[in-house]
């Protein structure tokens, strides 16, 4: 990945902000936007027109929620064909999806369900990623999930991700909030997670907020990035160096100016690290 893309700071493009990105001057403080792939995979219509017009002003990353790389019954090739058409049109910075399964025997749960970190699951995931990358004609990024249940398995999540990257050549989308949420829910050390991932495979970072459930933290994307997640982000960029970073907000979405202010915090942290490293 180029040094230029490593220094980018972006936001998720959501419907309440379409006007901000389409009318008047483009927000110069936003280097790129990320969209949910499935919302734009139908040719024609307003969503595709909005994406085309936004793409004229900003680079775009495609982030999926339905590829289901963990499905043991294989990957949906029709889905991949439609995603390939979208990617060819958009020429995205990144194409990404999650380490999870969402579909079985044609039924889609529309949720990011956890995997056991076993050799059998690794075989399934790697085979599906290989097919996806072949159809898409590019390496993709896989995001670490937030999780609320853990299996008795021989590998940690970071060991699984390391092996997955080594076998498939895919990159990582490191969701720092997901690390924090899962570490809290399952009692592992978030710093050990950062130490265990293959640093050279991390191409993008997600930041978001979470909510406190009755007994677990929930990855809700409905509030600002909290201080402990900022602290973990600072630790991540200290290990990784500058990485393209974006902030996710999917509920209780504030005015764009508030998200740009939050994005500036990430930019300032990264710039401070670069000055210290110089």
Curated annotation (Swiss-Prot):
Q: Give one Pfam hit by family name.
A: MbnB_TglH_ChrH
Report the InterPro entries cross-referenced here: MbnB/TglH/ChrH, Xyl_isomerase-like_sf
Superkingdom of this protein's organism: Bacteria
What Gene3D superfamilies does the record tag this protein with? Divalent-metal-dependent TIM barrel enzymes (3.20.20.150)
Which family would the database say this protein is a member of?
Belongs to the UPF0276 family.
**UniProt-listed HAMAP family:** UPF0276
Q: What is this protein called?
A: UPF0276 protein Swit_4400
Organism annotation: Rhizorhabdus wittichii (strain DSM 6014 / CCUG 31198 / JCM 15750 / NBRC 105917 / EY 4224 / RW1)
């Amino acid at each position: 990945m180029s040094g230029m893309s490593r220094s980018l700071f972006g936001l998720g493009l959501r419907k309440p902000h379409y006007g901000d990105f389409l009318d008047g001057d483009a927000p110069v403080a936003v280097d790129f936007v990320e969209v949910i792939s499935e919302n734009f995979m139908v040719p024609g219509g307003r969503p595709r027109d909005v994406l085309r017009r936004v793409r004229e002003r900003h680079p775009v990353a495609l982030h999926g929620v339905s590829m289901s790389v963990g499905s043991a019954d294989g990957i949906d090739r029709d889905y991949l064909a439609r995603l390939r058409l979208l990617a060819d049109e958009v020429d995205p910075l990144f194409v990404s999806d999650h380490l999870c399964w969402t579909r079985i025997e044609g039924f889609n749960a529309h949720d990011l369900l956890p995997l056991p970190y076993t050799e059998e699951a690794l075989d399934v995931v790697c085979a599906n990623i290989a097919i996806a990358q072949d159809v898409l004609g590019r390496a993709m990024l896989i995001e670490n999930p937030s999780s609320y249940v853990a299996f008795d398995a021989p590998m940690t999540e970071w060991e699984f991700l390391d092996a997955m990257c080594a076998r498939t050549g895919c990159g990582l989308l490191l969701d720092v909030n997901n690390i924090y949420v899962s570490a809290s829910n399952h009692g592992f050390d978030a710093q050990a997670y950062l130490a265990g991932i293959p640093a050279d495979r991390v191409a993008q970072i997600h930041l978001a907020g979470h909510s406190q459930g009755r007994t677990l933290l929930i990855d809700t994307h409905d509030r600002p990035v909290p201080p402990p997640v900022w602290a973990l982000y600072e630790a991540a960029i200290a290990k990784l160096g500058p990485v393209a970073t974006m902030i996710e907000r999917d509920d209780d979405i504030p005015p764009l100016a508030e998200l740009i202010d939050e994005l500036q915090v990430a930019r300032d942290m990264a710039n401070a690290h670069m000055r210290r490293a110089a």
